[in-house]
């Protein structure tokens, strides 16, 4: 795009220098601390799709680069690495706390996902989300206040519309808020998430490399039944 990438500064800390390079500005101490906390909170989280992809590739004997490329490919999906920006876009669409419940009803009626809410593992509040919420509230401002109010309204609406499946704010909901507060451009939300998770990918690949067995999950056929033989007379 004709933009010049800023070179890294080895004299700076990791979070400080990363924030300087992605924002183009000299970061403030509170922004550095917020991004540092975000990077630590999201660096690893079990066998997510990208981590499992990395380990599967590593189990074939492929090198680290191949495993990380596969992880990035899985991470590019909007339901995984692209979720923080979409969650913040949803917050933009809602606009105010009194719009939250009607907005949720519209999404559910249309069969669309409510980005920033629900998790395949957690059936309660995501502990990472609670920590990021605390970071956002400590920073304060209209965006943090709106996020907290919208979270309460959306969770109440989802409890009404989906009583058999409790859905709570996940890590992506407040991740976007924290990154926005710290001055990270929205186009860099997913790369920032990727920078954090790369630490976990590397650790998982190194661990997988110690096991010489290839990962080959068992599949269960769910298609139409086999044709019945017709007797020949």
Task: Write out the residue ranges for each language-model feature.
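Non-transmembrane, aqueous-exposed alpha-helical and coiled segments at domain scale
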Residues: 1-233
């Amino acid at each position: 795009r004709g933009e010049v990438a800023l070179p890294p500064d080895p004299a700076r800390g990791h979070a400080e220098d990363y924030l300087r390079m992605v924002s183009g500005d000299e970061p403030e101490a509170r922004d550095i601390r917020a991004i540092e906390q975000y990077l630590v909170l999201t660096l690893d989280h079990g066998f997510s799709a990208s981590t499992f992809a990395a380990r599967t590739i590593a189990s074939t004997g492929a090198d680290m680069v191949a495993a990380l490329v596969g992880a990035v490919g899985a991470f590019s999906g909007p339901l995984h690495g692209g979720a923080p920006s979409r969650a913040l876009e949803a917050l933009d669409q809602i606009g105010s706390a009194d719009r939250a419940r009607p907005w949720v009803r519209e999404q559910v009626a249309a069969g669309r996902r409510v980005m920033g809410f629900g998790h395949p593992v957690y059936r309660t509040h995501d502990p990472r989300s609670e920590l990021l919420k605390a970071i956002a509230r400590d920073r304060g401002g209209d965006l943090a206040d709106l996020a907290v109010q919208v979270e309460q309204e959306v969770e109440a609406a989802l409890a009404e519309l989906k009583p058999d499946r409790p859905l709570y704010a996940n890590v992506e909901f407040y991740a976007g808020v924290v990154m926005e507060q710290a001055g990270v451009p929205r186009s860099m939300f997913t790369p920032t998430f990727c920078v954090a998770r790369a630490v976990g990918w590397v650790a998982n690949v190194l661990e997988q490399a110690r096991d010489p067995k290839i990962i080959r999950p068992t599949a269960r056929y769910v298609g139409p039944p086999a044709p019945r033989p017709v007797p020949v007379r």
